[in-house]
Amino acid sequence: MNTESCDMVRCHDDDAVLDGPPGSFYITETEAGKIMWLKLPDGAASAINLRPHTTDGPSWEWDGNEDRPTLTPSVHRVGSWHGFVRNGRMESC
């Protein structure tokens, strides 16, 4: 499992997240709520649902800060990376 930590970098679209370094992120608004595109330290990009208590998959509480976000609970990609997003930093467990 990847144990890297990194600072986050805000991007202006989801393509920039794919091309950016680990920690790159972009927040978009959908009809269902906000979604964060996030590049994990394992190098993979994932969509993180920022809707609390959703019934159609995992979701995270978000502090609303679009520059240095904090998410709860931890983010876990099985077998690859597990950590916390706190104050604009991805911290490996």
Feature roles, as predicted:
Residues 1-37, 46-93:
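A short Gly-Trp-Pro
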Residues 40-42:
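Aspartyl protease active-site motif detector
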